[in-house]
Amino acid sequence: MWIDFYEIGHIDHPFRLDFEYFISRDTFQDEFIKSESMKTNLLKLGLQLADVTDDEFMQAISFQSRYTKLSLYDTLALSIAKARGWTLLTGDMPLRMAAAKEGVEVHGTIWVYDQLKTQGIITDDEYETVIGELIEAVKTGKCRLPKAELFKRKRV
């Protein structure tokens, strides 16, 4: 999900909402490699690193056998969200499906923008601009978001 915001130049947008954002320390250090500047910016904006407990790690291993399309980092995210009662933010469809099966609330990039608009944090015009930027990012292969959902939100 963070890559979507990075690709359209709005890495700060989720932090305008009154939420706390966490990522497992392992995922952040090992897999989350868009750029060092992206990592630095996310930490400055307030992204927090979560240390995985032994129980969460064991649950992640269990999830790997149950949800074979998920990486270890995906199962860590699912395990942490489930154990701590957190909402999972992801655009990864297999992870979203596993979260739903596990009773974990899950949302993604488009939901974040819907929240920004609904809460009056961004204007209708800003929302329209961002939706257009996301559509363009999908067209150019920079983001993987459901085009139909984006076009539903686009003004005619």
Briefly describe each language-model feature range.
Residues 124, 129-143:
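A late-sequence structural motif
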Residues 1-80, 84-86, 93, 104, ...:
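Active-site-proximal, substrate-binding regions of enzyme catalytic domains
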Residues 91, 109, 126-127:
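Residue-level detector of family-conserved "landmark" positions at structurally sensitive sites
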Residues 96-97, 118:
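Mid-chain, well-packed structural core segment of small domains
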Residues 101-107:
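A short alpha->loop->secondary-structure connector
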Residues 109-122:
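Long, charge-dense
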